Amino acid sequence: MSTMPHFSRTLVTTALPYANGPVHLGHLAGVYLPADLYVRYKRLKGEDIIHIGGSDEHGVPITISAEKEGISPRDVVDRYHAMNLDAFTRCGISFDYYGRTSSAVHHATAQEFFSDIEQKGIFQQKTEKLFFDLQAGRFLSDRYVTGTCPVCNNPEANGDQCEQCGTHLSPLELLNPKSKLSDATPELRETLHWYFPLGRFQAALEEYVNSHEGEWRPNVVNYTRTWFKQGLNDRAITRDLDWGVAVPLQSAEAVGKVLYVWFDAVLGYISFTKEWAALQGNAELWKTYWQDPETRLIHFIGKDNVVFHTLMFPSILMAWNEGKTTDCYNLADNVPASEFMNFEGRKFSKSRNYAVYLGEFLDKFPADTLRYSIAMNYPESKDTDFSWQDFQNRTNGELADTLGNFIKRSIDFTNTRFEGVVPASVTKEEWDNLGIDWQATLEQLDSAYEGFHFRDAATLGMEIARAANRYLTSSEPWKVIKVDREAAATTMALSLNLCHALSIALYPVIPETCNRIRAMLGFSEPLEATIQRGTSLLSSLLTPTLQQGHKLREHSEILFTKIEDSAIAPELEKIAKLIAEAEKREAALAESRIEFKPAISFDEFQKVDLRVATVVAAEPVAKANKLLKLRVQVGSLTRQVLAGIAKHYTPEEMVGKQVLLVANLEERTIRGELSQGMILAVENSDGKLFIVQPSGEGINGQSVQ
């Protein structure tokens, strides 16, 4: 089995969900269920582990939600913190502590970090231009600005990202910017902000990430390295807002400013651990989990949060640790970021209500059916898809027919024919001859959980159930008992011990069900009550546990009720409606793109300088999955042009192509890259782009007539 002798304990954190809406199944699959599977398994091993999570209660999305509803940000976060904590609890996500970044302890912790780093002279102050809403009398953070995306012409792009094409933006890049507060056109004004110099820590961060190559998932390492390749830039650490952690300075420049949520939120892991420690009656206990090198720190996140946990948070901790010999923080030993789980072939989208929300799901179906379905579809190395049909099939075919059927048959037959007691003793030899290599299974389970391969772990548990079913069916105790009661008794004793083994092996995945199995087996306490640090319950798989004479509970129960077609029909109707609405929006947007623009005169058209150009080099643009950076030859000149064609052409396909270039288009900067023109392309009804090219070989630089 996997062992880590250099770690005495483990601290698991999970990404903080924004408290401005309910969590959906995509969040559960990517972050919270895998963390819970891991934590529950480590507890079974008797290890010292705590699971810390909580709500991210600051940031622009929350203030926007509050303003839309005409309530305070506090009202918004109170509602969704309670809602999400309730959903997590009902789903069996076993946090040791679930905190809030609006707490006094968190504010003090975040301000302490800011002050420490500020006193070291690490922060930089910069004056920048931001949009200011004259009617509202305030600066506008990125999400308070909307406008037209410069890449795909989506007229409803946000100031931080275009949801349609995925391009990350700044408000200044939007065309026709408008304030979300007043719908007025904002003006640019100067404002002073504090910046964190990420580049100062790049060498240390690269060494840190490189030291974990081979341990971390390739997607985590590779994505982080794309940031290194670009070079790490200064990052704003303050914002002009009135909701958040106030900048702890007395200067006039700090008035009306709060800490940027990227800096504030990750420190919640620390402040929440402090609050947990206080509840244990030892206010200093948190230091053992954050500052003792014997503690292993693991961040469970989705892939959209990678850089915040491989670059941002580590650099903050490095800045704190700088110049200290005590009170230094540990950096994460692993960051097992998941890919995305989509919903019926499309990405989850809260803004478009294309989602299945966790609380609503649990109102209709048992938590363990969802936990199992997602574990078996865990997006470890590639995106996966949740579908109602798959959920129904797994519940009915695997949980009900395989696991539930075996448990009920074993207990019912024992209650009926053997007075509800384990009817025989079972030897180690008989246990080992069941056709299950218990030692190998235990090692495979350990490898799966310790390696964050949760689909493999769930599959191993279900394989035990299949083997148990095969054993009981092939042994036919209902026939054998008529001629050999002793043999039938041995079969049932082995079957009941298999029930117990399943209650251990599948516990991390379906904990409520496993405790129900234990109750039917006659155990008075749930498994959680028997867990002790230093004692592994997994070793009970190696030998039969239930001895002859052990009393079962008098009545069994059906563990899983099959899901009828009628139960998921409303969900399928709902998703069909959502897809139809999405397609309608997309069609309307497509139509809006082909509306004729206002007429121009011939003289105005003559001002457009169209030239034949040849692409001589092409490469992707980091963090903009629709853009290619092209170098084009125009006569004797070379130009750099950014084109939104990366979904339709590879860089290799573009090199050598002749294109038509708008050569006198005003230069602009997109995602930090200069674009000196525009190439022409057309879009078909399926949304595919085609480069407009000369029908014959043109001459570079030749004017288009």
UniProtKB/Swiss-Prot annotation:
Binding site for ATP: 350
Signal peptide from the UniProt entry: none
Domain tRNA-binding: 604-705
Motif 'KMSKS' region positions after renumbering to this chain: 347-351
Cofactor(s) the record lists: Zn(2+)
GO biological process, one term: methionyl-tRNA aminoacylation
Enzyme kind, highest EC tier: ligase
Catalysed reactions listed for this entry: tRNA(Met) + L-methionine + ATP = L-methionyl-tRNA(Met) + AMP + diphosphate
InterPro entries reported in the protein's UniProt record: aa-tRNA-synth_I_CS, Anticodon_Met, Met-tRNA-synth_bsu_C, Met-tRNA_ligase_1, Met-tRNA_synth, Methionyl/Leucyl_tRNA_Synth, MetRS_core, MetRS_Zn
Protein name: Methionine--tRNA ligase
Annotated organism of origin: Chlorobium chlorochromatii (strain CaD3)
